[in-house]
Structure formats: structure tokens, C-alpha cells
Amino acid sequence: MIRLVLILLIAAAALAELPLIAAQPALAYSYAAAGAEPLLDGREALFAAVTAGKWDEAKTALAAMQVDLDYLDQNEDKGAAQAFADAVAAQDAKAVMAAFNRAASDEIVRRLNGARDNLKDYQSAKVLVVKAQRFYTAIAGDLPPDAAKLISNALTQALDAVGNPGVFGVGQRQPDPGAFASARADILKALGKTP
């Protein structure tokens, strides 16, 4: 009897073109962490203010980026923060863009170094390479086309070199430190940084 009722319900639903199961939003899991990136988040406001010649607004936008600039200045590239301060003080739009490109390049290198140091931790390494890609995307238009293409390809290679834990082990690939090192070296060379 229950079987007959189920068959009738299914047939009725099919005839009425009703879904048998209520629609549910699909959930997805990503290893990439968006996270706040003050340099990237502040870039648009900074460039908009500079382009409009609103230097007080540029100073405000720069202030929101200051913690990250100070970190770069102290740990990665002495003078990175000062380059921004000097460019804004001189009201020099080209110098502001050059300072941003310098800081973004520093961030790319920093994230790749972090990924290299965490290559055995898939999630951390992948997130760091993805963040390096975000910084690359921000400056790609300002790079010579050959360098931009080389960096883009090398970032793809670096992401692939991180490996993949697979799903329940299926499709698992171990990290490839040699391929990662090669990709990193290509990126640093294209950015004019020392490996």
C-alpha cells in the first residue's frame, strides 16, 4: 500500500512538474581565504583620490594602508612606506602608482616565500599563492606584457606545484618543491627581485 502511494505521489508530481525535493542552496568549500588586504582594499580609494587630485582623500586612503606598509618597510623592503609618503606629499600620481607597484611586488614575494615555507600544508600554501595572484592582478596592467605573461604562467605553475590532497585521497598529488622553486624564481626575476 505504501509503495502504491509513493508511486502515485511521484506520478502526480511529475505530471504537475513539481520538484520532488525542495530546492536548497548549494554550499561549497574553498581553501582560499579572502581575508582583508588593506593594500588591495585601499588601492581603489587611493587611486581614485589621486586621479581626481584630492590629495587629502589620498592621505586618508593611505592611512588605511599604513599598517601593512609599515610591516613591509620593517620586514621586506626598507623604504616602501616612505615611497608612498613622499609621493603623496609631492602630489605625484605616477610616483603613487610606482609606490603601489613596489609594495604589491613585495607582497607577491612575501606570499610566495610563505607558501614555500608551508609547502607541506596544502591549505596554507594554496591560500598564500592565491593571495600572491591577487596582488599580481592588481599590477599586471602596469607590467611589460612579456613579464606579465611570465608571472601569470609561473603563478599557475606555483599553484599546481602546491599539490592537492584530493577527495578522500582520490586525485591526491604531493607538493613539488622543485617546480615551486622554479616558478618562484621566474616570478622574482620578472619583478626584478633577487631570489
Show where each model-derived region lies.
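C-terminal segment of classical bacterial N-terminal signal peptides
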Residues: L15-P25
